[in-house]
């Protein structure tokens, strides 16, 4: 009985978390396509190519991998050398 209650609470929590963290889909495709078309005409405009605010290896990043240039973060930015 306890396990069933725990499972129900866990599923409800995950469903609520999904709705809270979901993106707003109103006018999503309308706003997405003109931006993508602009990036196709000018590849330099792509946000994926820009890494201006990234930190080099050995700097503190917490647990947010987006701060590191290498995208590997475990408290500090990790850079692998081949």
Curated annotation (Swiss-Prot):
GO-annotated cellular components: extracellular region; host cell presynaptic membrane
Record remark: domains: The presence of a 'disulfide through disulfide knot' structurally defines this protein as a knottin. The cysteine framework is VI/VII (C-C-CC-C-C).
Record family assignment: Belongs to the conotoxin O1 superfamily.
Main localization, broad class: secreted
Signal peptide location: 1-22
Taxonomic source organism: Conus stercusmuscarum
Protein name: Delta-conotoxin-like SmVIA
Subcellular location field: Secreted
Alphabetized UniProt keyword annotations: Cleavage on pair of basic residues, Disulfide bond, Hydroxylation, Ion channel impairing toxin, Knottin, Neurotoxin, Presynaptic neurotoxin, Secreted, Signal, Toxin, Voltage-gated sodium channel impairing toxin
Keyword Glycoprotein found: no
PROSITE patterns according to UniProt: DELTA_CONOTOXIN (PS60005)
Residues excised as propeptide: 23-49
MF terms in GO: sodium channel inhibitor activity; toxin activity
Role summary: Delta-conotoxins bind to site 6 of voltage-gated sodium channels (Nav) and inhibit the inactivation process.
